[in-house]
UniProtKB/Swiss-Prot annotation:
Record-linked Pfam families: Rota_NS6
InterPro entries in UniProt: Rotavirus_NSP6
GO cellular component, one term: host cell mitochondrion
Organism domain of life: Viruses
Identification of the protein by name: Non-structural protein 6
Subcellular localization, as worded in the UniProt entry: Host cytoplasm; Host mitochondrion
Family statement drawn from the similarity comment of this UniProt entry: Belongs to the rotavirus A NSP6 family.
Organism expressing this protein natively: Rotavirus A (strain RVA/Human/Indonesia/69M/1980/G8P4[10]) (RV-A)
Length: 92
């Protein structure tokens, strides 16, 4: 598998993780959802260390992707408090 394929696989795994977490939202609170996303991202950060640094996403990029996922969840829930909670949870 070449580097471009590895990066594509990494991004697909991230999207699958975010998507599966979103579909559990009916049963989970936003904080639980965000924690699940963080576990997925942390796992992928560890996993991607086998890739060339030139093709890695750094932690900031992954957190930006997590933020986008939370915004997406917010849009699907139409709940202003959800996004405020998500931003507060994600912020260092």
């Amino acid at each position: 598998m070449n580097r471009l394929q590895q990066r594509q696989l990494f991004l697909e795994n991230l999207l699958v993780g975010v998507n599966s977490t979103f579909h559990q939202m009916q049963k989970l609170s936003i904080n639980t959802c965000c924690r699940s996303l963080q576990r997925i991202l942390d796992h992928l950060i560890l996993h991607q260390t086998i890739h060339s640094p030139a093709f890695r996403l750094d932690r900031m990029q992954l957190r930006q992707m997590q933020m986008l996922a939370c915004l997406w969840i917010h849009q699907h829930n139409h709940d202003h408090q959800v996004i405020l909670d998500a931003i507060k949870w994600i912020s260092p």
